[in-house]
UniProtKB/Swiss-Prot annotation:
Function (record text): Splits internally a 1,3-beta-glucan molecule and transfers the newly generated reducing end (the donor) to the non-reducing end of another 1,3-beta-glucan molecule (the acceptor) forming a 1,3-beta linkage, resulting in the elongation of 1,3-beta-glucan chains in the cell wall. Involved in spore wall assembly.
Active site: residue positions: E176, E275
Entries under InterPro entries matching the protein: Glucanosyltransferase, Glycoside_hydrolase_SF, X8
Name under which the protein is recorded: 1,3-beta-glucanosyltransferase GAS2
Example of a GO biological process term: fungal-type cell wall (1->3)-beta-D-glucan biosynthetic process
Molecular function GO labels: 1,3-beta-glucanosyltransferase activity
SMART domains assigned: X8 (SM00768)
Keyword NAD: no
Residues bearing attached sugar chains per UniProt: N498
Species annotation: Saccharomyces cerevisiae (strain ATCC 204508 / S288c) (Baker's yeast)
Signal peptide interval: 1-24
Lineage per the UniProt record: Eukaryota, Fungi, Dikarya, Ascomycota, Saccharomycotina
GO CC annotation terms, alphabetical: cytoplasm; fungal-type cell wall; fungal-type vacuole; plasma membrane; side of membrane
Lipid-anchored residues (GPI-anchor amidated aspartate): D531
Amino acid sequence: MNKKQNFYAAIIVAIFLCLQLSHGSSGVSFEKTPAIKIVGNKFFDSESGEQFFIKGIAYQLQRSEEELSNANGAFETSYIDALADPKICLRDIPFLKMLGVNTLRVYAIDPTKSHDICMEALSAEGMYVLLDLSEPDISINRENPSWDVHIFERYKSVIDAMSSFPNLLGYFAGNEVTNDHTNTFASPFVKAAIRDAKEYISHSNHRKIPVGYSTNDDAMTRDNLARYFVCGDVKADFYGINMYEWCGYSTYGTSGYRERTKEFEGYPIPVFFSEFGCNLVRPRPFTEVSALYGNKMSSVWSGGLAYMYFEEENEYGVVKINDNDGVDILPDFKNLKKEFAKADPKGITEEEYLTAKEPTEVESVECPHIAVGVWEANEKLPETPDRSKCACLDEILPCEIVPFGAESGKYEEYFSYLCSKVDCSDILANGKTGEYGEFSDCSVEQKLSLQLSKLYCKIGANDRHCPLNDKNVYFNLESLQPLTSESICKNVFDSIRNITYNHGDYSKSNPSRSKESLNVKYPSSEERENDGTIAFKTSGFVILLISMIAAGILL
């Protein structure tokens, strides 16, 4: 992009911002993006009744590893939310319009920021957004999966922030969480996330925005995954596949597209390519576009999204942002623009679809059978994370952990140590067996605090020394206050009474509800081998402070 083009792009941004300031955040109409709804296995325009085909591109700016490392925690998020930055999105929208896209896939947004300007500007150009609910640091981990209060709160905050926009097409509850046969046990957690996100939308007076899943194209798992997410009582609303089988100048017959189309014929929910664009040949010719929107595939597939808009180290971009924050068009851009311009899928109206046949019944799909080493996703799902229950742990546990931040390796270290000393079954979640501990839905800090408190009680603690030497470990003075029979935490306390310590005379005091950090020695490797009493050291100042609290001086 030359200086003249950069100048005009800046003018467009300035004009749009002025219009927003003069007319308010609702100055742009959403008439060009009526809500898209699902009927059977198709997307339809809710006003015209015409079938909707996704013709889109992935749109997400990433921070480089070097940038994150040099920043030393200065950034609010590890990702860049372009939809919350009008300078970025308004710069890019003219180029997205040139591409001929009608949908963006965005992988992470900051729910604390306003997205009004960018979402309204996209709507003015007839563009929708498919949005992932997770973000890089808050998501379901395929190797150690959990569906807990922390992740659920993230999902709810995104839903609350974005559901008012009519051009919000749908949410992804996960992306490639199970990516091969070694981690199929992670899929029950994603399915639980779909269930709870849909339930939250339903009970929060939000528009009924669909929630789906984006998977990879692994040969060993793709059939079972496709069945798993539409079987049983909990089902995805749509299903995306990150598809990279077509490279260069492949064909419908040689690429694998023919086989995939046959496999998904009659699939009960909308299915589309949530990513496509193999880059083994550069510039990419994007010849797969003509096949995807052609007669052989458009009756099965609801379109797709090219990966991706921004050029990064992985070399999948169609534009490159230059040193002046301007946009330089790459050869891939011209090829994708040309292919999208030719794409003209022949759809069906909602009325024709309903008249031709009844929508496919999702209930008819049988869940895949468990096969060790092949498919190990149980039909039984984790329960909905219970925020109130988990918050009670913060009130009643004697020892408490606060987040370790950059020292995330401590979680694994401390869990390994504590679970060698106490029974951790109440925090374990097993997607293979369908067994989920009572507190497996709590945050990682709450789960670690529970196990630390067990060890504190196991060693017969009669003071306020928690058995880990770490600045993030606290003795919880709030736990010393006796619970009344009316307390909402009484049931939680009763459920762990047999594994936690009765603080005896401490309950007679009325300490402050603050938390007190203790300088307690972390057991050495030799001490960890002993199951008996562990010696702990504290500074004289801390001993004095504890004595003062016990005497009521700090009331």
